[in-house]
Amino acid sequence: MDFFDLDIEIKQERLPAECSLNSPLNISLSSQLTDRMTPQNENIRRQRERIRTHTKTHSRIKHLSKLDNDSTRLHARLTEDLIKLQHLEVDSPVFDNWALLTSYYAALDYTLPERASFDWGQAAPYWNLYTQLRTILLQSQKIRKKDRGVREIYSCGPLRLEFVEGTVLYFTDKQSGGEFTKSGELPSITPYADFLAWVKIISQRAQAVLMAVILRVTDKGLSPLPESLLSVYQTVDDILKRAGQPAIDLLKLWEPLVITKLGELLGDRFGLEEDFRLTIRGEATRLAKKLAITNGLNRLMTVLDSQTEAQPLFQFFGLFKHFAYPRVFSRDTIQAIQEVSDRPSSISAAEFLHDQCEIRKEFYIRYLKAYHRAPGLDLSALSPSSFLRESLEHGKIPNEKSPHYSNKEWYFIKFTKSIEWPISDTLSTFLSDKAITRDRAAWIEEGHSGRDMSEKRLLLKFIKENFSSVAEIVAAADAIYNNEGDRLIALKVKEMELKIKGRGFGLMTFMPRLLQVLRESIAKKTSKLFPEITMTSSDLDMKKRKFMLSKRSDDRRGFIHINKSLDINKFCTSQRQFNSSAVFSSLDEMMGTFPLFSRVHEIFEKTWIVDGSASDPPDLSHFTRILEECRLHGIEAPHVWADGVFSGLKGGIEGLCQYVWTICLLLRVERVMQKTKLTHYILAQGDNVIITIIVPVEIHRDGIISDQESRRLLTLSRNIDLSLESELEKSGLTLKIEETLTSENISIYGKDLHCPQHLTLALKKAASAAIISSEQYQDIPTFLSGLGTSLESLSECVNSKTGAHLFGVLMGVAGWKDLATHQTWRGWRYPYHKAPLSGRVRASDMKIGKGEAVELTIPVMSPRQQGKETLRELLANSLLGSALGMLAFPTPIDLEKRGVGDYITHRLAIARKALLSEKLDPHIEKRVRSACNLPLSSRVDLSKLFDSPFSLNLATEEDATAVIKRQAKKTLRLQEIGNDKLRAQIGNMDKGIAALDADLAGAETINPRLNHMIRDITDEKESEMFVTKFASARTMRTLAMGDSSEVPIVVLLEKKSQQKELYTIWRARRPHATMWKCSTVLAKGLRDISWGKTIVGVTSPSPIEAMETTHIDPTDWEDSRSRETLSINYYLSRAGIDEQTAKLTRGSLVPYYGTQTKPLIAKAYLELKGNPRTNKALLLLSVRESLVKTGSNLDELIMQLCSHALDIDAASLPALRAQEEATAGEGLRGGIKESMSPVGPDNFYTNITHKVFNRKWVTPYHVNIADFIIQGLIETRKHLILNEKMDGLLPLSSVKCTACFRKKEREFFDIPEGPTWKNDSTTSDPAYTYFTTWCDLPRVSTLPTMDQQSATRLLGRGLSLNRPTAGEIITKFYSMSMESQRLLHPVDLLLGYGEGVVFGYIRSQHIHHGALFQTKRETLTNKLRKFILDTKTQHAKQIGYLFQDEDSLHELMAQGLCPYVPRSIPLTITELTNACAITTIRATEVILSAGSRVALMPVQAIDETDVDNSRLAANTMQTILGDSRPMNPVYLDCDLTTNMTAWESSIELDVLKSENFHIDGLLMDLTARELPISDTPWKQRDWTCSNDPRIIAKGIKTKSLFIHQGVAEALNMTPDLLVVIGGGLGGCAVPYLQEWADVPLIFATLFDERERISEDGDLVVPPEILVRGMAPRMIERELLEAELCDVTNDGNRRLLTRLVKKNRGKGTVVLIDEIENRGAPESLLQSSLQDLVRRLDKVCTLTSIHTVRESTVEQFAQRTNSIKRDRKTVTLHWNRYNRRDQFEALVIVKGEETRSDYHVSTATAAQAFRKIDEQLEVEGRLSATRWSLPTLPAREKEILFGYVSSVFLKTNLVLSADDMDRETLLETIEDTAPGLISWKEKLEHRDHAFRSDIDEKGITQDKVFNLICLAWVITGLRYGIWETDAQSIITKTVYITRGPKLCPLGEKPKRVFASFKLQSDKRVEDAKGFLSALLHLEGFFPLGRQ
């Protein structure tokens, strides 16, 4: 039986496209293969030749046309003959093991009828034939090594089969008699797909008959007699044998015929008109006469007419759904049926008009409700006095009862475009929706995914090139509809598989596709008008919603729900009547898109639709030719219109314009429902409409519903059916009878009361077990795998589930065993594999000799023993779930849909029951027991074992308590009730429901399946009962295995047990006591008071407090009245005791609603989740959360917090993200994941399925709620056994702070709701600032109240202590909204950060050495330096944010904050790193030298003294930093500043004019030569900025502040206007403003550019200069807006030009262009700039100054030419701050120069730079004089110090102000440089070391490079000789001598301690940068102190 033993998985090859089962091509294909038609393509021709060779060799047939290829007749004949030859015993091992099966069912309390009571003989022939054919299929697909020339022939009785070249040959032996084929041995041939279709038909018949046989015994009256089925099949074969292919048309009328008969039985329940029956029967008779098979039809009708019961007759539906051709009636039949049922023509003109008007009215009303304003209307056609006009002009809904109202007037109203849809938006929907391609080749080839990005890009390109707006595309609609070439639409099987919306969409020609998507995406814009439509929901969601709807008001008494699910026949086809046009035209009017929607009908009339599974791309001329050829061969339409082409209106093309069709349908249904005046909900999705109606019913006090009411209900339901039908008929829609009839269910209290599932077609479902939808390729695995799900749905149809299960077991043993257990398939192949593929697979056990023809006979009977094993395995699995799992067990319907957790419990309970019954076969028992123990081992995930077959998971967000409550009420129904009063109540309810059921059952022969599930049993106020069914894993395992000590709880769950107890929970009201409030609640209160104001709070919440619990001792809880104790108001007692007695003999306490709160983190998370405004706050939250969850670097306090307060292992605290995943239910089927373990106390999980199985409880009390209750019950039970009185002692935890209780807990404790606070503030949103920053977010630990400064420092400190995974926190920090940080002062944060670094270092030392070494200041400083350098990059980024909020400018200014905010991250990593490192090292030095005590990190909580210490440290730092409030933190480029202090306001604006800064530049003229443009080679630039983290910055970026010095003088003019573009905030403007004091300024920072180069950081001007100094001179404020500053935007350039013209037209204007233009998008920028300059040139005399920096001289020349503006001469301005490692200079283009067409050549530029170099050499070589600093103002000195230290910082050396003198500098470098190498730990506290002690691993090339640079500096400082050849410098070796000390470069010491050399010379550029930076400095002022 086991076919699954191959060890290689083979990829299933797809069949030839022609073999799709539903393809009309099979006939045309076989005609082409047998020479009856010319092959359409090369492949088929070759295939034909190969078949011909085969038949010549083996059958001596030369002419293929002699082969019989009529598969219809052949298969009918074969079926007849083979059935006669079969045994009359069903061949299945199940029957030999009937006893085993009987005992299995007995174990589950089912009785299996005797084997003899089933008439298996009737099922045997089909069953056995099917088994043989299936075996042949399996054998033929098994991979084995094939030798050439060996034939594989399969036999089935006398029939022989051979698979050849994609076809099947059928023949018989000479010996065997019986004419199987026309002439003895002459073979017949059919395509493989036809053979599969035949096997499928046999399989379905076998299953249908088998099911009928079983149901005959288990569910009497449910199914037809097997005899009548067999006679139907026999007649059908006979008909097919006689008439062949055309008879299929007749069989398609089978269902309408069944309907006519049903209509007779059920009266007009179907709403069938008499003439419909006559037409159908007449049509059938006519067809039969035409085909000469009248007798056959009569025999069929006799069988039909003999059926007199509705139920069995119902099963005749769908008997022939499996024919392998499209289910399309012939044209005549369609017309005949349409004339009767679709009758749009029968509607009178008045009715039609009324209809159109109703639709317009509906649109109007919906618009009004959705948008609260009337749509735009054109009322001109209405008379001015019209009543309707008057209402509409006032935007009202007209009163229809008014005598003046006339519905007809709506016809004259036109909508004017009312719904806005921006072009870009529509196009984006359009693009994301579909991939659209013009490439027809892609239609057929495999591998084109529907969502191919490149296709979308092509489309976008196409639109951009051809259309400027959506309107244009719409306008093109006319042409498209009328274009001959666009008339083809193709369907491609693959597309359907991908579920791309609109079945016809896939291969539609290009332009109609464009329209189609455009139409859909525009229609979606109306979604606000049609909330009922859910196009995106899957079937699953639809089911969910339906389920939820029926529960929506389950607690309201006296309401009954009626659910109907409408299914409509040929949905889109039928709607293409003119009636729906009103909807389309209304949409067109509202959208302003005529004729996009209105013409939709036409496209169908004019379209040819081609089956895309055909082998050739559709093509009209080719198509017509083939069509002719087909007609000649007598192949009739519509089956094979050539390549499967059919016309648009003839069905098939579903789904186009789906959304609008849905609107049409919805409006009709809504119209019917409104007339009922009942509460109703509608969900619509295409042709699926679900309607839920809520009907009030009168229920008597004794629970009985009167006859009158039940009759009213039935009439109501039927009337709705009828009116729906007549309304839908107006659109030509017919309801699908079977589906609609069987969908209606009536429920009360959310439970099904009347479910017509018994009408569902059991046989049809059984037979469809093997149905394959046409999209799947026909391989055996797909062929078989349909079984599991079909059986599952089958079990819903059958009342006695034993029948369905028995059927499943039979099928399973027949070969689905593997599917039932593993659900994997291996080693199958398509019979026509390519040889090499088969060759790779090892040979199977069959050896075939060369050249001999071997016939493989397959034994009909299989070995019995093997069958028994299979059966056992199947049954064991079926107990524990998986594919056949659920079938035999009566699972309550809502449990089925509940999800894994309940499902597992349910299975285990069933398994346990079976095990305890002792009736199970021991082998099965053994298997089940071993499986049940699985959860104890970690090897197998429990949920893998219980893989629920229900994909439907309606896990609504309920907590454990709700689940328990729900389950309890269910279980309660099964208890023996002791309380008389209660028992009487329940009895009453039962009586009422039974009466209702009886009434419903009166509906003819329909017997409803009853469900006694009642929601609310007793009055809640009096008492509440519950029993729990769900518990922890421990309890669950107890359920499964009977040997645990905790059995008592299981007893409660057993149905048949005698020892049940019932407990009552009493509730007593307590007097209210004032309770304690935790800091979180106080902080919230504070927040509420200060809402809308910028008050900074004084408390900060503490999670420890919020999670603090009190333990309550039950012995005295009721008497204790003290303030701290909480009262628990529930306790248990035995049933039937009055309250007073219960108090005296009370049982254990049960906190029914669970009294732990969620931990704060989770609480804040849930509060914030989903609110877009507060979502950002979550990011901040997670920063803080990570403080709690880091491990190593935190103190004991946090560890304890995690272990005790949160009841989890700190190391495994999951991120909130995991929690979110869990809530979303991801990974549910994959198993219950570890990540789902709850955050905080266990009641936090939101869904029962997130249970974590192997839990270690921290305390015996801290368990989840279910366990609480169970424990209460178990304790109570123990007490009852030991004592008579119940005095339980179950202590429990409760949260201290009552204000933290949730709503349910408040109810529980009788605590009234506090007054809720409403925000009546008018400000936009400042309150959230405060909320998101401080309130509801936990702090690291409990601190005394702090002012805001200290609090901020704490955060900074936290950041420095927390080492996040690379970039994690950083990213979150940056993506936070700025408003949440608006009140944090950066300086505070930095101070906190500095302090944290010190603390962190000291603590790490403490951890390493067990004690802190008290060393002298120097060594500690050095170590700190190292520590800071190690950690700086990790943390630098976290501080680098600025403030950004235009609205709060004034508020910020008032607080002393700088208003400027760039859009990108403002400072580079390097800069921040430098700033932080310098700041913290300075601060640390001061703290240590001041000798103030720095405490070690505290082990327990932080106390007052620690806080004082940290404040002291911070204040000390403040004095160093000169932080006097208020201050303006302005970030200069950090390369320029020692720390992040601001420019003091007191600085004079003219400081920068001091001598030192007055730098004269060198001016060079560049003259253009006669070098025509074409000769200039345009060099492609690479990305040269230092953004790449792998490149060390190429030296120091020179600052525009210095570069522009002296230019204003050189220009020798005073302009009328200054325009600045680029340059950050334009430091470049400062030198000019100093020179020209009163020139007005236009300031346009190029933000776009800034974002691109932000890694380099730009200069930010002091706010005084900007705000105070420049503001008066600003011309137009709006130019500061980021959007206007982007000159790549044409509008901005125009604006700039206009402003210049307006203010200083014809004057002289200076333009400073500071744009670094060397990146990827340079062409755009360059052309924009050229354009801008050209425009400005026309309106004024323009002098432009451009910063140009390029890496090669060619690029420099190129760039100069691009900005030269046709000037003959441009001037180069160069000064010492320009870089020398690249070609950098200012290019000045003067306004008044003459023009020329020539360009500056590369040679000219090179010469200019050479001159500059020569001049420099002459001006002064770098001398070796003493180090000295010129006298500078202190401020500038600091700037320059900063510059020096930042140069050194690039080599990882931190310098302080003390090091700025020559000797100190030398000493520092010599001593600290070796520290860059990581020596081993033992060297840390020694001052000497050995060479062998160097830890080689720590030495990277970077460090060696840094050493070389520093050694070079030592040489320069010591000897005054500065070598400038970088190439030779980096090749030298650098030595370290004993000490260790660094030696000058080029010197080798006597005792070499270590030496290093660079491995590669790639560092030349870096070295040049470093050297030039220091040389510039040295040239400017000698390093060191005077």
Swiss-Prot record:
Keywords: ATP-binding, Host cytoplasm, Hydrolase, Methyltransferase, mRNA capping, mRNA processing, Multifunctional enzyme, Nucleotide-binding, Nucleotidyltransferase, RNA-directed RNA polymerase, S-adenosyl-L-methionine, Transferase, Viral RNA replication, Virion
Domain named Mononegavirus-type SAM-dependent 2'-O-MTase: residues: 1592-1788
Protein species of origin: Hirame rhabdovirus (strain Korea/CA 9703/1997) (HIRRV)
Annotated gene: L
A Pfam family: Mononeg_RNA_pol
Protein task: RNA-directed RNA polymerase that catalyzes the transcription of viral mRNAs, their capping and polyadenylation. The template is composed of the viral RNA tightly encapsidated by the nucleoprotein (N). The viral polymerase binds to the genomic RNA at the 3' leader promoter, and transcribes subsequently all viral mRNAs with a decreasing efficiency. The first gene is the most transcribed, and the last the least transcribed. The viral phosphoprotein acts as a processivity factor. Capping is concomitant with initiation of mRNA transcription.
Protein name: RNA-directed RNA polymerase L
Family: Belongs to the rhabdoviridae protein L family.
The keyword Ligase is annotated on this UniProt entry: no
Description of how the protein assembles with itself and partners: May form homodimer. Interacts with the P protein.
One annotated Gene Ontology cellular component of this protein: virion component
Main location: virion
